[in-house]
């Protein structure tokens, strides 16, 4: 009974987790990624995005791929962290590697992050735990504000990760001049 209660509690906490995550970067009707420490010049110059994760976070990446490619007109590849680590594939040096991990301690994701950094590729972490290994080692960090997630089945962390990725897609589209000011404003209205 305890696990069911915890899961239900976390399901009901999803709206707050999403709103807190959105409020961390949306100020006065615009997305402000200064806390993530990514510049508009960097956003303009990325040629590709790799999204690397495991489990449910990988599913967030799959959904985000469609939004990023559609809105920001940038090529996106989603990779399981274990595959990213061991496959021999050419990596675009002008890419951004986004790793997603609720805990910030997922072993394969951390190893993939380290590999990307060794290759000289800019990295960004989307994590829920401040001070986690992945957060400390990534070049840029977008914190989700879902709070602790006790239930095995992810709920609020998953939803907050989706919200974070949508914010990135909208801001990349705006900075890369792929959407109009009106489309940008409407996108923010839809998620707020």
Give names to the regions the model predicted.
Residues 16-26, 30-31:
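Edge strands and adjacent loops of beta-rich recognition modules
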């Amino acid at each position: 009974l305890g696990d069911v209660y915890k899961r239900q509690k976390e399901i009901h906490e999803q709206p707050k987790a999403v709103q807190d995550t959105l409020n961390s970067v949306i100020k006065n009707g615009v997305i402000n990624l200064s806390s993530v420490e990514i510049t508009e010049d960097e956003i303009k110059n990325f040629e590709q995005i790799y999204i690397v994760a495991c489990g449910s976070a990988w599913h967030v990446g799959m959904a985000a791929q469609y939004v990023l490619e559609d809105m920001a007109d940038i090529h996106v590849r989603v990779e399981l962290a274990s595959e990213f680590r061991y496959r021999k594939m050419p990596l675009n040096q002008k890419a951004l590697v986004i790793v997603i991990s609720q805990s910030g301690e997922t072993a394969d994701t951390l190893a993939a992050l380290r590999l990307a950094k060794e290759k000289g590729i800019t990295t960004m972490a989307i994590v829920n735990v401040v001070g986690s290994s992945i957060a400390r080692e990534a070049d840029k960090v977008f914190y989700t504000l879902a709070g602790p997630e006790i239930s095995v089945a992810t709920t609020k962390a998953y939803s907050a990760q989706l919200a974070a990725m949508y914010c990135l897609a909208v801001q990349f589209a705006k900075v890369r001049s792929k959407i109009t000011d009106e489309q940008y404003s409407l996108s923010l209205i839809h998620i707020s």
